């Protein structure tokens, strides 16, 4: 290599590394509207539409029969798949009582007590109807427990009144939510799990140069992860043995909070993306984990390694013999009405997805 070529290479590589990382404003501009879109498991349409609107113009997105949004780019082997899920925890109406209250069933795993006596929204498909999640009986005998079945009140007073409002069995409920900036680079809201993963995939795809790819990469925004990884399972079965490696892009439930002990899942916010080496559903092969760490170090992507609870979409590819290497970011207070994220970790996650797609 000539001195001039070497000099050009030394200049271009740092500039490219810098260009790969989205700005904090880029992160906010994608994440905030996704957070403020509603999509309980099975009703992800509004979130899928929001993602579609933010994809780069060259991306050709398709929706499969399950409702997964899919973008395929590049050709040849190995085939690498990234999966972030569209859905959020919430409730579905299972029955409407004569007194007009709505009986609810959970979609996803969370503590019901977090939602007692809080504002509610019923999503009818046409509009969102305000209501209230019922509290436990304040005059009942001790110990007072969460109501069974859990219910919501929209103020109707009768089943006929609920019907007149256009509310039906099968409609979903959530708590109202918004993206709220906190001090520094942190933010709070509900459904960062997994709108951060969705955001990181969008930001990576925007920076991806299809001409640089030497193989095929598929980006999936999956449905119904919170109720059994159902959308990802459809993708895994459709691709079968063709997939070489899958990367679930999802939350790392961190113990980095004022409340929790630090003996497990202690991955600090603001210190970068996370290689989710071990969770309840999958184990990253050690050789692949080591290779990922070396790649991140070489490309100067902040990366932590940890083990946590929960499962991930990539695990359903295991029945096809596909290794799952989950990519994550640390989150406080997961599956609560007020999760907390550091936007610098979202930057790092988007950058990590990009370098993995291009160079691994």
Report each predicted region and the residues it spans.
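N-terminal hydrophobic/helix-forming segments and targeting peptides
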Residues: 17-360
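Bacterial N-terminal signal peptides
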Residues: 5-16
């Amino acid at each position: 290599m000539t001195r001039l070529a070497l000099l050009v290479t030394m200049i271009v590589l740092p500039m490219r590394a810098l260009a790969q990382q989205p700005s904090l404003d880029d992160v906010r501009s994608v994440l905030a509207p996704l957070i403020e879109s509603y999509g309980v498991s099975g009703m992800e349409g509004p979130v899928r539409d929001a993602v579609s609107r933010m994809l780069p113009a060259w991306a050709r997105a398709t929706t499969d029969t399950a409702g997964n949004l899919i973008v395929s780019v590049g050709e040849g082997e190995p085939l690498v798949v990234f999966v972030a899920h569209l859905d959020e925890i919430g409730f579905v109406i299972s029955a409407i009582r004569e007194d007009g209250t709505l009986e609810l069933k959970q979609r996803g795993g969370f503590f019901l007590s977090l939602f007692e006596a809080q504002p509610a929204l019923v999503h009818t498909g046409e509009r969102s109807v305000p209501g209230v999640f019922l509290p436990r009986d304040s005059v009942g005998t001790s110990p007072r427990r969460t109501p069974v079945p859990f219910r919501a009140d929209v103020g109707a007073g009768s089943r006929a009144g609920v019907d007149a409002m256009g509310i039906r069995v099968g409609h979903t409920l959530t708590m109202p939510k918004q993206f709220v900036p906190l001090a520094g680079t942190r933010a709070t809201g509900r459904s960062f799990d997994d709108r951060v993963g969705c955001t990181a995939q969008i930001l990576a795809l925007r920076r991806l140069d299809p001409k640089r790819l030497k193989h095929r990469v598929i980006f999936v925004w999956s449905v119904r992860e919170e109720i059994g990884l159902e959308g990802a399972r459809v993708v895994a079965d459709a691709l079968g043995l063709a997939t070489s490696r899958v990367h679930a892009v999802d939350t790392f439930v961190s113990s980095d909070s004022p409340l929790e002990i630090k003996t497990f899942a202690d991955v600090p916010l603001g210190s970068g993306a996370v290689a989710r080496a071990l969770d309840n559903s999958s184990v990253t092969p050690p050789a692949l984990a080591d290779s990922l760490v070396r790649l991140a170090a070489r490309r100067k992507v902040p990366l932590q390694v940890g083990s946590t609870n929960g499962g991930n979409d990539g695990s359903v590819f295991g029945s096809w013999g596909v290794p799952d290497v989950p990519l994550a970011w640390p989150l406080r207070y997961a599956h609560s009405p007020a999760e907390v994220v550091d936007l610098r970790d979202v930057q790092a996650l988007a950058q990590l997805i990009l370098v993995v797609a291009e160079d691994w």
